[in-house]
Amino acid sequence: QYVSPGFIDIHVHGGGGHDFMDGTVEAFLGVAETHARYGTTAMVPTTLTSTNEELMTTFAVYQKAKSLNKKGGQFIGLHLEGPYFSPKQCGAQDPNHLKTPHPDEYNTILEASQDIVRWSIAPELAGAIELGEKLNSCHILPSIAHTDAIYEEVVKAYEAGYTHITHLYSAMSTITRRNAYRYAGVVEAAYLIDDMTVEIIADG
């Protein structure tokens, strides 16, 4: 047998037959207790691209579940995954809810929850750099995800505070040919930018 510190899961959508987007306290507690049985003592519940109404429900339920969570891995903040993603790299995200960042919308979201600690975004979208700067001013981590950005766009994003990459290799650009030229993508940028941190889905 082994004794070790508890795991901290920084990107988790559910567990034990529950999803955080179910929008119920029971789902949140069920996920927390399931993961605790396997050694996770803290986690960052992660959303999916959805309607703003569903997002607001998640914010309210998170607060209730956090106060009631006595047996499971503790909730240490929310990770918003979407809706500001590239349609070309949407992966498992609902393409019907993808959009570009607009200050009126994301400021409303930020005002609605003080629990957001990370927001995954495609940095090449119009308005994404400004959003990254806003998140940094709020001490929220902007993270690169579901993106078709080229290397130069990633560098610009990094300079604006996007210092992390969500599930590297999954739903993101690599070397592509555009007209007569080849461009490095997010995968290459992850290796070339020394201080960029990355997240890997270890089970494939």
Describe the role of every protein-language-model region:
Residues 81-105:
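Flexible glycine-/small-residue-enriched beta->alpha junction loops
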Residues 65-67, 99-200:
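Histidine/acidic residue-rich metal-binding segments in metalloenzymes
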Residues 25-28, 59, 183-187:
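Amphipathic alpha-helical segments in well-structured domains
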Residues 61-73:
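A glycine-rich helix N-cap at a beta->alpha junction
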Residues 13, 29-58, 73-86, 113-124, ...:
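Divalent metal-dependent hydrolysis catalytic cores, especially in the metallo-beta-lactamase
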Residues 14-26, 92-99, 141-145:
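Active-site mouth loops of central-metabolism enzymes
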